[in-house]
Amino acid sequence: MDRWQAMRVFVKVAETGSFASTARQMHMSAPAVTRIVAGLEDLIGARLLVRTTRSVKTTDAGSRYLQDCRRILGDIAEAELAAAGHYAEPSGTLTITAASMFGHLHVLPLVLDYLDAYPGMHARTFFVDRPVNIVDEGIDVAIRIGHLADSGFTAIQVGAVRRVICAAPSYLEKYGVPATPAELKHHRIVVSQSAWASPEWRFAEGQRVLVDPVLQSNTNESAIATARAGWGLTRVLSYQAGPSLQEGALQIVLDAFEEPPLPIHVVYPEGRQAPAKVRAFVDLAVARLRGNPLFN
């Protein structure tokens, strides 16, 4: 068995979630792809892939082996370039994910500058307000807000954001400024369903308040627009309200009761052995995000 080719086939199957798609992309027959993966599993002595009704997923052992294969194949590619007298330059397609609003406001400008710096590169952005599986969905770099589970991935903290409650000055002038979380029950509350997991808002020192939202919006942008219109109070992340706060269109209340900030991390699977395209983007993202006063 050609071990390196078997690794390439396995990686492609894991990334595409399909034996048939792998066969087409690698100009092989589907039975050949199946035989190669089966032979690799026999050689290793562990099941790497499991078929579901719609796709192919990696097992726990397969996920770990996938990371190792990517690192090893990346090392081989860079060694071949070095032996040929070439420097490893970013190449191929980079896939980046982030929360929707954060992606549009702060990641997309990074991607555009990255593509300008490396004209041969292509990029795909995946900005969604749901958990994204980095391995299953073929993500190269993820920008994550919040505390991370132990995934074995490399994570570089680049800043933090606050959970803030804010309203338009006109609303606060009309209805008053709440002095404690308990006073929220006397106010009109607007929430975003994308961030709405519980009617319970938590505050520092374990304080909790049940809120009854008068309006639930399907996007953070809509919730912020409603608050800007002077209609009610909303709770969002500080970067989401940043432009409105800077303009004076919104004002933060109850900041003395805020929970600790949420960390922002740049996350990627391969660590120090990441391919050049990933390292170049990570270096750019870390420098720019750490230099942004909104996150520090």
What are these regions (language model features)?
Residues 41-60, 250:
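A short LG(V/I)-centered, amphipathic sequence patch enriched
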Residues 29-32, 36-39, 110:
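Residues within the DNA-recognition helix of helix-turn-helix
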Residues 91-154:
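Central regulatory/effector-binding core of bacterial HTH transcription factors
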Residues 12-27:
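Short helix-boundary/capping micro-motifs
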Residues 24, 42, 63, 116:
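Alpha-helical residues within the helix-turn-helix
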Residues 264-274:
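A bilobed periplasmic-binding-protein/Venus flytrap-type ligand-binding module shared by bacterial periplasmic
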Residues 53-56, 63, 74-97:
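Short helix-loop hinge/linker segments at domain boundaries
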Residues 133-138, 148-264, 291-296:
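C-terminal regulatory
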